[in-house]
């Protein structure tokens, strides 16, 4: 445990946490797979180093009691680095939902089941490339075929989240980097990697409602939007832990164009996308604005 720095009297940073508690591709000397807790703070749009925490867990101690104790230790470490406790933590594994909820509740931290954990997944991919292969007991390939992922059929968006009108839009990446200066209501902004082309167009969706824009934005934020994707001729919004929402049906040409735009942004700009909510197309204020990432599932 890291002792608090007595000179650090001001906790000037706060962010949500992104958490994964699961086994890793490493066999311990006792023949059991390694379990590990990973925590990353959600980065602010302005950048800066995130808070990160990694801790191994003996396979026989995988329970909410151990996890709550580890969370307390993570809170102590975060305080020593000048971080206030998080208001909420996000966790994306359905299999671990109950355990994480119990541990978070013990520390009075709200747990949000959500795949909107972009920073954590980036870190997990980094560890899979650079850390685990160097460990003794590393399993270079699965010992058995991985289970097929459960796909949730898309259902129509709730009435409260449907705009009166919608349209496709693109914004240059450099413009998105300035989104923190825009007049925003509900929002979820992401940092922009400085090495990417600022002129690269980012695809997105604009929703309009002259009378319900603010309420619509509030509902949409509660869904925890993750990414837009094309399935056949349908525009799908993946959200939350495993939700898929049907936004609209497209004609063949529209579906092809959207698929191309999403593929291009995956290749060049980390899969960045956006959803905007406005009263009218001419209103400069966004009642809601979320940056999304079409990121590979870990």
Annotate each language-model stretch with its function:
Residues 1-298:
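Secondary-structure boundary/capping micro-motif
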């Amino acid at each position: 445990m890291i002792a608090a720095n007595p000179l650090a009297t001001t906790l000037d940073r706060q962010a949500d946490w992104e958490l994964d508690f699961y086994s890793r591709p490493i066999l311990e000397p006792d023949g059991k797979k390694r379990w590990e807790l990973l925590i990353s703070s959600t980065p602010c749009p302005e950048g800066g180093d995130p808070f990160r925490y990694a801790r191994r867990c003996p396979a026989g101690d995988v329970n909410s009691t151990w996890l709550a104790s580890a969370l307390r230790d993570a809170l102590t470490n975060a305080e020593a680095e000048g971080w206030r406790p998080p208001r909420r933590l996000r966790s994306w594994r359905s299999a671990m939902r109950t355990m994480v909820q119990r541990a978070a509740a013990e520390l009075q931290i709200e747990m949000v089941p959500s795949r909107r954990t972009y920073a954590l997944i980036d870190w997990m991919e980094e560890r899979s490339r650079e850390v685990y292969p160097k460990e003794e007991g590393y399993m270079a390939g699965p010992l058995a075929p991985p289970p097929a992922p459960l796909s949730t059929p898309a259902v129509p968006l709730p009435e409260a989240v449907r705009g009166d009108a919608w349209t496709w839009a693109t914004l240059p990446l450099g413009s998105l980097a300035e989104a923190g200066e825009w007049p925003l209501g509900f929002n979820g902004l992401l940092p922009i990697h400085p090495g990417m082309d600022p002129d690269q167009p980012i695809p997105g969706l604009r929703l309009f409602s002259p009378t319900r824009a603010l309420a619509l934005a509030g509902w949409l934020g509660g869904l925890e939007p993750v990414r837009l994707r094309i399935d056949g001729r349908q525009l799908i919004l993946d959200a939350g832990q495993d939700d898929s929402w049907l936004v609209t049906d497209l004609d063949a040409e529209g579906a092809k164009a959207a698929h191309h735009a999403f593929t291009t942004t995956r290749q060049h700009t980390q899969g960045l996308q956006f959803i905007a909510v406005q009263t009218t197309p001419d209103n400069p204020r966004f009642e809601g604005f979320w940056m999304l990432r079409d990121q590979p599932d870990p």
